[in-house]
């Protein structure tokens, strides 16, 4: 019934309703599409609505050299744009159709392959490589990002196709370690990736992010936990990763490096269990004029403050720095506790009192 409507009526109906899908009921879909006033391309509409049957029909029209394909119903730029988007989403059938319609798989430095790899779409990766995509393009982006996101099957496939696991100073294994992808890390090590690249970045960032099994594995492979002034144990402490801290200490990490930075920063961030463990292992809570309690007070970590006081820290150090910072930042319970154990609210010309009044007002 709809097929017998004149083109001008179709245009009016679609322009009024905004429903381009109505055109799909007409065999002259593409001709009508070019007549409506809605600002949208054929490819954009078809791809975004996952109309694979329409894409296949377009491929057929191209193969038989139908005159409609000579008209500007799609451009190479738009084909490339949606090839990249579809590759990122893992839409293999759409990717195949777009390539058949003339999309360039190597556009934007093989961006389609890079994004398909990054997001773990193995079938799309295999298809694009089969069509000539370069696995080493853009500084081996594909394998680096597949490793970063833990897509082991994609990593293995890219390696089989010649990807360089050592690119960008072994960035693949560094990022895999940072993000906790043990299987990828082990695989890359089996291919002789350098775990000590960039001043032992891999073990430092695995520690920082709390990936204990990766830390243990890297240490077993010869990683240096003492690199960069014991960065590993410092940042594991800062982020509250107690089990990682314990393991690193068992491997002779120096918890007092950089003037006891580990316990100071763990106190600052409120990681009570880490603070307790570090103190039991010999960390000094009194360094830098009892900086640890000042930082804990500033950030309102009452339980840490109580623990530090129990361990003999000086709450009146630096002219009652702790209560002044607690007052300045509005941590009433910390202020009350510090007062109860002898902090002087009148220190520094009644600084704490004045800050409390300001916050109340």
Swiss-Prot record:
Where does the secretion signal sit in this chain?
A: none
Q: Does the keyword Phosphoprotein apply?
A: no
Q: Write down the SMART domains for this protein, in alphabetical order.
A: ANK
Q: Which Pfam families match?
A: Ank_2 (PF12796)
ANK repeat residue numbers: 77-107, 108-137, 138-167, 169-197, 198-227, 229-257, 258-287, 289-317, 318-347
Alphabetized InterPro entries for the sequence: Ankyrin_rpt, Ankyrin_rpt-contain_sf
Sorted keywords for this record are: ANK repeat, Repeat
Cited PANTHER family? ANKYRIN REPEAT PROTEIN, GH09064P
Report what the protein is called: Putative ankyrin repeat protein R901
| Protein species of origin | Acanthamoeba polyphaga mimivirus
């Amino acid at each position: 019934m709809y097929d017998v409507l004149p083109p001008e009526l179709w245009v009016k109906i679609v322009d009024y309703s905004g429903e381009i899908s109505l055109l799909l009921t007409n065999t002259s879909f593409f001709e009508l599409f070019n007549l409506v006033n809605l600002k949208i391309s054929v490819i954009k509409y078809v791809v975004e609505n996952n109309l694979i049957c329409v894409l296949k029909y377009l491929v057929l029209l191209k193969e038989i050299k139908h005159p409609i394909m000579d008209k500007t119903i799609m451009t190479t730029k738009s084909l490339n744009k949606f090839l990249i988007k579809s590759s990122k989403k893992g839409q293999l059938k759409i990717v195949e159709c777009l390539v058949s319609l003339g999309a360039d798989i190597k556009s934007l430095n093989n961006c389609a392959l890079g994004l398909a790899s990054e997001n773990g779409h193995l079938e799309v990766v295999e298809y694009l490589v089969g069509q000539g995509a370069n696995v080493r393009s853009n500084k081996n982006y594909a394998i680096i990002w597949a490793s970063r996101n833990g897509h082991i099957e994609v990593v293995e496939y890219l390696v089989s196709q010649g990807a360089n696991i050592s690119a960008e100073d072994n960035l693949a294994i560094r990022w895999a370690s940072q993000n906790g992808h043990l299987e990828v890390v082990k695989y890359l090590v089996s291919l002789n990736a350098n775990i000590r690249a960039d001043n032992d970045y891999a073990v430092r960032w695995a520690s920082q992010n709390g990936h204990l099994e990766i830390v243990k594995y890297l240490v077993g492979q010869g990683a240096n936990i003492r690199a960069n002034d014991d960065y590993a144990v410092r940042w594991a402490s800062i982020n509250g990763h107690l089990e990682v801290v314990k393991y690193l200490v068992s491997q002779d990490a120096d918890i007092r490096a950089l003037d006891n930075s580990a316990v100071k920063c763990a106190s600052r961030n409120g990681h009570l269990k880490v603070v307790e463990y570090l103190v039991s292992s010999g960390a000094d809570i009194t360094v830098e004029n009892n900086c640890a309690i000042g930082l804990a007070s500033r950030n309102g970590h009452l339980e840490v403050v109580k623990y530090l006081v129990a361990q003999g820290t000086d709450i009146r150090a630096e002219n009652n720095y702790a209560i002044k910072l607690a007052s300045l930042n509005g941590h009433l319970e910390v202020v009350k506790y510090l007062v109860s154990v002898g902090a002087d609210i009148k220190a520094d010309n009644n600084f704490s009192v004045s800050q409390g009044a300001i916050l109340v007002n």
